[in-house]
Each structure stands twice: as structure tokens, then as C-alpha cells.
Amino acid sequence: MAAPDAMTSLVKSSVALLSSAHESLPTSLAAMKTAETAPSSTFGILGRVILSILSVLPTLLFWVSYTLPTWLFTLFSMSLTFTMNFTTLMLVLVFVVSTISYFVRYRYLTMYARLPPEPQREEPQVEVFPESQEGDSKRGLSNYLDEFLSAIKVFGYLERPVFHELTRTMQTRRLAAGETILLEEEKGFCLVVDGLVQIFVKSNREESDSDEDDGELQGESGGGSAQAHRQGYQLLTEVKNGAPMSSLFSILSLFTEDVKLRHDEDSGPSSSTPMSPQHRPSMTRNSSFNMDDSRPETPIEAQEATIRRRRTSALASPTAGGRLSNVPPLSLDTDGFNDNFKHSKQRRSPSRSTKPKSAHPDIVARATVDTTIAIIPATAFRRLTRIYPKATAHIVQVILTRLQRVTLATSHAYLSLTNEVLRTEKLMNKYTTYDLPGFLRDAPLERLKEKFTKETERLGSDEGMKGIALHNPGAGRRRRTSVSIRSSTAAQARLAAARGTSIGSNVEAISRLTSPEQGMRNDRISAGDLLTNTQMSRGTGRSGRSSFSQPYQHDVRRDARTPLDASGFNPFASPSMRPNLHRQESIDEATVFRESVLGCMFKAIGLTSPENPVPRPAASVEQSPRLVSFDAKRQKAIFTSAFGFMDPYEASRDGDADSVASASNLSTLSASGNGNLLEEVVNDVEIVFFPKDAVLVEQGERNPGLYYVIDGFLDVSVAVEEDSSESNVLGTLPTGPAVTEDDLFGPPLQPTATNTSLRNGENSKKKRSRKSLFMTRPGGLAGYLGTVSSNRSFVDVTAKTDVYVGFLPRASIERIVERYPVVLLTMAKRLTTLLPRLIQHIDFALEWVQVNAGQVIYNQGEESDAIYIVLNGRLRAIKDAENGKVTVIGEYGQGDSVGELEVLTETARPGSLHAIRDTELAKFPKTLFNSLALEHPGITIKISKIIASRMRALVDDPLHEQSKERSNKATRTNVSSTVNLRTVAILPVTAGIPVVDFASRLMNALNQIGVPRGVVSLNQAAILNHLGRHAFNRMGKLKLSQYLADLEEKYGMVLYVADTPVKSPWTQTCISQADCILLVGLAESSPNIGEYERFLLTTKTTARKELVLLHAERYCPSGLTRKWLRNWPWINGSHHHMQMSFRATAEPVHQTGRRLGNAIKQRVQVIQAEIQKYTSKRVRQTPLYSADTPFKGDFHRLARRLCGKSVGLVLGGGGARGISQIGIIRALEEAGIPIDIVGGTSIGSFIGALYAWDADVVPMYGRAKKFSGRMGSMWRFALDLTYPSASYTTGHEFNRGIFKTFGNSQIEDFWLEFYCNTTNISKSRSEIHTSGYVWRYVRASMSLAGLLPPLCDNGSMLLDGGYIDNLTVAHMKSLGADVIFAIDVGSLDEDTPQAFGDSLSGFWATFNRWNPFSTHANPPTLSEIQSRLAYVSSIDALERAKNTPGCRYMRPPIDPYGTLDFAKFEEIYEVGYKYGKGFLAQLREQGVLPVTEETEKEKNLRRTMAPRRASI
């Protein structure tokens, strides 16, 4: 028992121990938990997870290995039997099939119906931000100054010292209402500061100048005094605030009073030359104000001088009382005025022979209200001429340019006063004819002709017509750079000036060379053959060239006027002659000819030789011209001649003039230093031979240079169009070839030129007859006016016989004009002398107007009082509709005219006219027209022709017919929006876009396309290089605007590249000067508004804005363009997709740290790129099928769009017959004809959309063939049949076929611009679709009524567009397309005569259809009648399309094929391809194709810019 007890006690003790341990366990665990909380909890959770997995795992294994197999065995061992009849089975089967068909048909296959809605983009409204105009009356000092500054803008840019010098002696006068002044007596520049002045001219005056001999041009300007009071006066114009009362002629006369008309070596000073200083001792302080005039004082002048000396503000009145009564409108029969006027005429009659010609002949001014005028006296202009000669030349250049562009061009092209304008060309010959020396007339000339004859025989007649130039060994040794010349000769020029060296000594050598004595020396030298002595001069530099002055150094020393001249340093002599004065070298005859021709040219343009020097003042005065004595009381400078300080060969030695008035010009003109002028220019002279009938200068082009006739005769003529009925004088409507506006402003950038060449063969080359004006004999100069003034020629210059001429390029003339202002002043003097008085009166009334961007010129409903001609800039005419919307009537660019119809019919303005940008206008007042019409009825006839031609254009214009009764937005808002664009701004969306590279490529494309007069690209660097660092400050803004206006007039198109930060002045200038703004963005970047767009919106510009999206690859993802256009509602032009390789981001900066991580990341990116090559969709960068032509690029497409030379493709509807259009497009591609815009109707919209998508033939062919296969399946058509309530089919299969072709692509994403038309039967009109999902509007355009149901779009039902217009040529023309290829594949109309009587039996009609012996035509069926009714309006539109200018109508022979013959795809395709090849070959034979190479012929017109160098 002991053992069990012991065992029991042991158990009890163990239990007690375990219980105590159990009781102490929580405390120990708690302690451990507090010690190691985190690790114990983590391991505890992990342990529990492991234990639970181990506990569940056996259960799971048992279920999988035993339970599941048992259940499956039991299930598959069971037997289940269902019993049902056939009806139940069929119902179940039908239910299942229907359910599946429903989900497949209406859920899966109708994805096209569940696309997110993308409605058509609304056309943006016309932006109008007019400036508030307060009328003509302004008050306040600031407005007073504004009026004065606006009046003197006619002088162009005036620097501050020049402005102060011009206005320091200005006088302000006050005219009472009705007070009259004789502008003929006013010596100065008059302008109206406040008030209104009427200008009158004698109306009954006999224009005797036109009947007199040419030598009598400087006759006196009025009738006798007895007839003065019987002369009626005609209102010429009204001068308002800020307008000058003086004309451009009067300004030129003030500057050129002391300039000689002709410089003869053997003649003394002419009557126009002022007295020398020693003959004018009486010029003292007691001299009156007008003492410098070469005529005695009249009582009126004495009275005026007295009043001026007393400094009164009242104007001298012709009457004793100082005030006149009101002058009647057409006569000035006031007694007091007539008596005084008669008395003054009698007093002045003895001195009439010495009276200079007045700048204001027969002009009277009358103040309508109390008026304030300002007068800048003539002395201010003389002093300005002396102190700032280059500034004077600049002003004269500006005035001459405006005189030509405003007065002469308007008179010539607009008023039909061609004879009056061209008289100047003829009469100028007597001032510019200088014969060559006699020793060059015989043997040397014969040897010259012999060499040219041999070369002509070798080259042939075609090459010879371009001109053959004599080999010029010195042509390669042109002038040094401007920097080196300026640095090396600036000090030399001042040293020569200090020593009194005459620059005119250069001509001295020429004069001796052309003397008979020198001719004998030349005979002794025996020049021999033309290249006898050129081998020695070819290999040497400039110093080694045989100078024309070297063989005659003894004569130079002998003829020197002073020892200082002989021994002094001459900076203008050649470097080779200075160290060795006795070097003798022979001269070849070519050099003698060039130097002689150059000497005669210099005399003709006004550069005198020192035998008859212009009188010079004392040397002391010359050294300090700013210290000229000036009498402040008499406001009279005590000096002699207006050119006393400016020798004709003096290149502006005045330091102040150089630094102030010409510093910026010298920094940009190449080779403008003061080197030896003859040495520099003689190498530019070419001896050129032109055969008979060769054209040297064409009417309307810039003169290549000066032509000096050595032998032969030149015919100066004007071209006359034989058929000018289609011409539109100033080019506002592109209806025909503009002829006279080419002479006015050069060829316009509009679709008129190409239209002429792309019409019928007989119309493409119109015969132009020439009206001969005069002949230029040997010794005469051709191209003088146009070359010196840098304007276009009014005349044609052709070779009447075989002619040998000396040619000096325009660039050399421009250098001479810039350095020697007397050349311009001489031409201005001759112009003011020769132009008839009628032109002067027109110049007086024509007003040069400068308006700011957004400024309103006239408002809708105002009285029409003037015609406006655009000199540069752009205008937009708008009309406010009754519903509050603004519509564009038209836009007018350079050379266009506005307002003739309203002025002639005396009706109110039909709309408002405002300036899109800063614009210069010529204002032609109605009063001037009325005045001229009385004496020159031809003016009325000319204007009537203009109005009649415009009315005819409106009647014949298909666009006008289309928009007259329909409200087609696309046709109406884009009227003339791309016509005659002259300035284009390239603006980036945000920083970092390569606009400079873009502009460079665009400019190259524009040059290849062929813009008339060329293209120039401007960026900030170019402007700063030309105008200096002050180009954008307040002082340089006027100078900058004038420079930009000159560039716009000189070039056909100006590109402004905004390559500066956002708010820089240059960016603002680019925006303000643009006719069209191209916003360039990267397609893959964010479409959010960039900083440049925000700045653009703040400028409130109304210019046309177009979006350009640059793609790295030739692919545009669907919906990308819509994202851009959705955020940019102000894009009122089109958008362009262009491929351009660029670097989107800059090179990343490599970090120095974590090199291993960067290397791994870079390696991963490389691997991903390699994988994407094989997994992603590859996008081709070039078209699969492309002809070898450079004109199909994206930049050429944009260039043609900007120039108005776009090529459009219009595809008509006709069902399966439209497959032939694919073959014709392939033929166009192979011919190298680019397509820029695509439009289509019905099947044409489908084919056109396929081509516009990628601009590629191969994918278009594949997709079209796939679609034809679907349409050719009769099973698909049968399965789509439905109950014919609205149509025979549901349209689902048709929708599926189109959607599978285009997917969710949108029209905006197409690479080419595309549109399609539909017929809106809800609103009974045609609609044009240019945005939205492609498949919807292509489907709508193909919806044949009855076969397909209409497509619902925004509540409207759309059907086939061919019901109204099956060939949308009119809309394509409105988009700016110049050449249009229209392909018509519609069915022919059945026009067989019918005679079935007044009633018709259906049984008889059916029997007659099957009766082969019937003689009656088959009557139309009901469906045929409905079809003919539907296409009634389309037939009329088709006939108008065929007659549209520039349209090439094509109809392939596809009549045997039906509308649904899609199964004959290959056959129809081959028919179209063969027809296209034959049609284009025919056009090529007619000389019409290629379209893009027409500019090569135009380049050859400038034959003498780069004459052929024949190594004779």
C-alpha cells in the first residue's frame, strides 16, 4: 500500500507544482511581453499562421484526393432523361439564337453608335476690336501735337535732331472762316492742325503742256491778268485735322530748288544753279524773308514779309481788310480779291521770265471754319539739306516712293492717265543722254560686234535672247567688306576733307579718257583685241589691276588746281597708284568701254565732274556747318546755296550727319565705305548684247539696273491687253488676270496668275500688243526712273534692233544713291519739272492715310465720300446682320481698292471697314473725281469699266450664286480670307518649339513654289542688324514701321519669325504686322493654352489665325486634333498637319551620383525600345507610294496655301463608277501633281477621305478594295433588308462597312484638308462638313434616298450631297484653291424626246418596253421620275462648275457601269487610270502641266540680273 500512497503523494505534489507554475506563468509572460513586445508578437502571429496551415493541409488533401473524386464519380454515373416535343425544342432554339443575335448585332457590331459624341466644330465669329473714334474735332495740347505729328508722317522717319531742325522755324497761323489764301504764293510746307480747309483749282484752264513741244515744259503757269477773274474754280479736296495742305510735289520742290537738271561739261551754270558766293554780296541782315527767291517782291510778298517780321499770328490776306467774304463753290468772283489779284498779276508781269515754277499752280485754299494751320518755311528745308544731307536724301526717297505708289501708280492704273504719266519717261531723255567719245565709235565698236556675233552663232538664238555679257576679268574682284572699308577709309576721308581734296577728281580721269585728245592716245596705245592685255590682270589682285587712272598720272598732276591737290594724299585713288606715280600699263578695250559707259552714267544721274563744280562755301564754314550764322529775328540763315556744304561727290563728311542721320544705315549696307567710287563700281558694269526683240525690262517688274545704249535702238513701250474684259483693275475679286494692278503694285499674291495659265489653251497665252512710246538712241539711258527710285517699271524696254548696252546692276545704283544724295535730288528735280500740271493737281488731292490696327475707316450706313486704295496692310469689310451676327464682306490687301460703287452711285456704305493691322491707304476723295470727270471724261469711263467688271464678276461668280440664297457658313465666312496675303507671322505655342527651323524650311518651299518678287524672312537679329539696338524703342518705331513697309512693297511675302521671349517688342511687332498668324505647336505636347497664346489674346488682333501641328512621324492619332481645337476657339483659319524631324526636349544633364542606378535605368529603357520595335504598331514616316517630286512635301503644301496656289481635288458621286477616281488619283501622283485640299460627294467623299487620311495611294487602294468587296456581297444586302417604310435596308451593313474602314477617326485628323457635302432635307439646304467622325458624314454623303435611311445629325436628316451639288467646285474655290481637278462620275441624263401623248397607260408602257419593234421611246418609270426630280438642282451646279476659272473638268468613260457594280473593282480602276494618264498627257502637250514648274519661266525674265558670261 505504501507504493500506491507514495505514488499518490507524488502525483499530488506534481499537480501542486504544476498549478503553482501555471499560476506564475502569466506573470512571467507579462514580464517577457513588456521586455520584448514587438518580436514576440511578430513571431506569435507567424507561428499561428504556420500552425493553421499545417492543420488545414491534411483536410484539404483528403478532400481533393477522396471526396471530390467520389462526387464526380457519382455525378457521371447518374442517368438523366429529358422529354419534349419538336415545337418546344424549336422555341428554345429560336430564343437562344435570338438572344445571341441581339447581343452580337445590337451590342457588339454597333460600336459605331456608342462612340462619344463629337459634334461639328462651330465656325468662330468674326473678331472685331474697333478703336473708339471721337470724330475729327479734338481738343487739348496732346491732341494738337498728335495732329501735327500725324501730318508730318509723310516725311517718314525723322530723328530727333532732324525733327528739331525742321520745325524750329515753323509758324502757326489762324484762318477765319471764309478766309482764302493763295497756295501758289506760299513758300513752305503747310498743314492743317485744327479745322477744315477746302482746296480749289482752276477748272476752265487749257492744258497746254500736252499740246506744246517737249522743250516747252517749263512754260508759265497761268493766263493773263485780264482773264483771271473769269476763271472758275473747282473744289479739289477738303483737308481735315492732321493732313497736309501741301502736296508731295511741293515738298520735293522745296528740297530741290538749287539742284541742276543737267550737267554739261561745256555749259556754264544753268538758270537753276544759284549764284556763286562772290556774286551775292547783298545778302545781309536787312534781307527780307523771301530775298533768296530769284524774283522781285510783289506787294503781297512785301506785306507778308512785313507781317512775318512783326511775328503776328494772322495770315496775310490778299484784300485790304485782311479777310475775304465766303467764296462760292465753283468761282472766286470776289471784288476785293480780284482787284488785288489783278493788281498783283500786273505788277509781276515784267518779272515772269525769271519766276521759278510754283509747286502749287492755280491752287487756292479756303477755310470753311476757323482753322489753325502750321507752315514750315522753305528756309528750314534748305538748312536741313545743308546740315543733314543723308537725312534729306532719306526724306526724298520716302517721298519719291510715296509719289510713285500713291500719285503716279493711281493715275496710271486707276485713272487711265497713262499718257500723262508716261510723258515723263520720254521727256527724261533730254536730261540723261550723253554720247560716248568718238574714238570708241568706229574700229573698237566693230571689233566688239564681231566678238558678240561669233558667240551668238555658237549659242543659238534661244540662249541669245537672254543676253550675252562680255567677259569681265575684274568681276571676281569686287569690293571689300563694309567693315574693312569703313575702318580703313573713315580717317582718310576726314583727312582729305581737311586738305580740301575733291572727290570729284575720280570723274576727271573719265572726262579726260573720253576726250578727243585721249582718244588719240588710245589709238597710240593700240588696245587691239578685247583680251589682248587681260592675261596680266587676271592673276593679280586689286592692286595689280591696271587702273584706268594709272596711264595718265602726268595729266592728273598737270590738271591739278592747287599744289595741295597734286601732292596731297588722295584716299579715293587706287592703292597701286599711290606708291608709283609713273607706272604705265596698257588698257584693254573692254575696260575702256566700261569706264566710258560708267562716266556717261554718272553724268546722266547727276554726279558732276569737277570742271563745273557746284559752288562751295568758304573752308572755314565747311569745317563747322552747325555754326552757320542765323538771324533769329528774320528767321533767316545767312548762307549761300542749299548745296553749298554738299559737293555732289561728297559722301557726307559732316560728322554730325553721319552719326545722327546715317549711322544705322552704314552698319547694314555692305561695301558702303568711302573708297574710290569708280574703282568699286567699274567692275560691276557689264557690256551686254541683246538681239532684236529681246526684252530688257518688263512692265511691272523691278528694273534690273541701268542700261546705257552703246549701239542700236531700244523701244520703250507699254503693254496693252487686247481682251481686258476679264481684268479686275485692282484685284479685289480673283475673277481674271489682273493687268493694270501688276503695273501698280506688282503681281498680286492671289489665284489670278495661275488661273490664266490653267484655262483653255487659247486663253492661257493672251496676245499683248505693245504701244510704242519713244526710242532710246545711242547715248541714252533706259530704266532711269525705276532703278534710281527702286520702284517698278511702268514700261516695257525691248531691243528694236540688235543692241549693245552697258549694264549697271541695281545693287550698285543703290550703293551710289545711299552715299551721294544728289542723285536722288536730281531725279526729284527732274520729276517736279517734267510731270504735267494735271498730275500735280491729282497729287494735291490724293491723301496718304496711315491707320492703326483695329481702327475703323468708315462705319456701316455712313455717307460715301472717298475711294480707298491699299498701299500696304490689310482691311476687312464687315456687315452687321439683323440677328446680331457679323459677316465678312471681303478682305483687301495691297493694291486693292474699296468703295467705288458707293461713291459713284452716291449710296451709303454697305458695311464697316476696319484695318486688320497697321495700314497705309491712298484716299481718293469724291470731290477730286468730280473735278477730274469734267475735264477728263476718260477717267469716268475707266471707273465705269471697273464697276461694270465687278458687277459682271458678281453675276458670274458661282460663290456669289451659292451664298446668295443659302446660309453656308463655310462659304460665307472665309470670303477672300487667303487672297493676297503679304505678311505671315510664325508664332510658337510655347517656348522650345523650333520656329527658326520651321521658318527656314517654309521659306525654301516658298522660293521653290515661286512667290512673285520673292520672299524675305525677318527675325529679331535681322532687325537689330539693320536698325541697331534702338529699333524697338520709341524713337525707332517709326523707322521700323517704314522699313517693314518698304520690305513689304519690295517683296511678295514677308515672314515674321517670333524667335524672342513672349513679351518682347519683336514678338509684339510680329503679331501686329501679320495678315496671317501661324501658331506652331508640337502635336504630341500638351494642348493647353501656352504663354504665347495668352499674349496673342491680349493684343486683340483680328488677323487670320491658323494652327500648325508638327509631327515627328507621318501619323496623327485619332482625336488628337480635336483636343487642340477644343481649347483654341479663336483659330479662325484652317489647321495643318506637317511632318518635321525635331528634338522635343534638350539633352538631359547627366548627374554625377548614383551612376549604377542610372546605367541600369538606361539599359532598361534601351531594352524596352528594342521590344517595342517588334510589338508596337509601326508607323511609316514616308508614304508607301510617292512620285519623285519635291513639291509634294508638307512645307510646299503650306506654301501654296499661303500664296493662294493650292491645288484642289473635287470628286463627284456616282456609286461604283467612283472606283475610277482611284486610278485618276494614281495618274496625278505619277505626274507629280500635288494635292492640297480634297472634297467629295457620295462615293467621292469616301474615296477622297481615304486619300486625305494618309495622302497616299497604296492604303487608299487597299481600303477601297476591301469596302467594294463588302458592298459587292448580295448576302449582306439581303440580310439588311427591312420593311420599306423609309428605305429598303436598315443601313446597318452599310454603316459597318464604312466604320470598319475609318474606325473612330475624325476629319480634323486627316493629313490633308478634307470636306464632304450632304443634303439637309430638314432645312432644305446643302451642308459642308469639315469636322467630326469621318464615317458618319461620309455615310450621310453616300445615303441614296430609298436605298438607305437618312442619317440623323443634331436633329437634322442628312442625305446624299449629290442631290444639290454633285461636284463641289464652287466651295473648293472659296477655300482658296487655284487649280481644281474635278472628276465627275455621275450618270448621264436621259434627254431622249418623248411623245406618248397627254395620257399614259401603264400597260402600254410595260408592253412598249418589251416590244422590240416599237418606234416610241420608253417612258420613264416612277423611280426614274423621282430621281430626275432629285437631281434637278445638281445639273445646274454641274454646269457652273465646268465654267469655273481654273477648273480642269474630267469625266472618264465609265457609262457602261452601274451604280452598284462594286464587284468590277479592278476593271473600273483600270479605266480611270488609263483615262487619267491620257488626260494629263494632253494637258502637258498643251503646255499647262506641270503646274508647279511655271516659275522657272518667270526666273528667266530677269535676264540681266545674272547675264551669261561668255568667254569671248
From Swiss-Prot:
Source taxonomy: Eukaryota, Fungi, Dikarya, Ascomycota, Pezizomycotina
Locus of motif GXGXXG: 1213-1218
EC number: 3.1.1.5
Active-site residue list: S1242, D1360
Biased composition (Polar residues): 268-291, 751-761
Gene name, Swiss-Prot/TrEMBL: NTE1
Entry binding sites for a nucleoside 3',5'-cyclic phosphate 1: 669-793
Cytoplasmic side stretches: 1-48, 105-1512
Keyword rRNA-binding: no
Cellular component, GO, one term: endoplasmic reticulum membrane
UniProt keyword Cell inner membrane present: no
Residue ranges of every copy of the PNPLA domain listed in the record: 1209-1373
Protein name in UniProt: Lysophospholipase NTE1
Gene3D superfamilies: Cytosolic phospholipase A2 catalytic domain, Jelly Rolls
Source organism (scientific name): Phaeosphaeria nodorum (strain SN15 / ATCC MYA-4574 / FGSC 10173) (Glume blotch fungus)
Binding site for a nucleoside 3',5'-cyclic phosphate 2: 830-950
Keywords: Endoplasmic reticulum, Hydrolase, Lipid degradation, Lipid metabolism, Membrane, Repeat, Transmembrane, Transmembrane helix
Biological function: Intracellular phospholipase B that catalyzes the double deacylation of phosphatidylcholine (PC) to glycerophosphocholine (GroPCho). Plays an important role in membrane lipid homeostasis. Responsible for the rapid PC turnover in response to inositol, elevated temperatures, or when choline is present in the growth medium.
Top-level lineage group: Eukaryota
Regulation: Inhibited by organophosphorus esters.
PROSITE patterns: CNMP_BINDING_3, PNPLA
Enzymatic reactions: a 1-acyl-sn-glycero-3-phosphocholine + H2O = sn-glycerol 3-phosphocholine + a fatty acid + H(+)
Compositional bias segments (type: Basic residues): 343-358
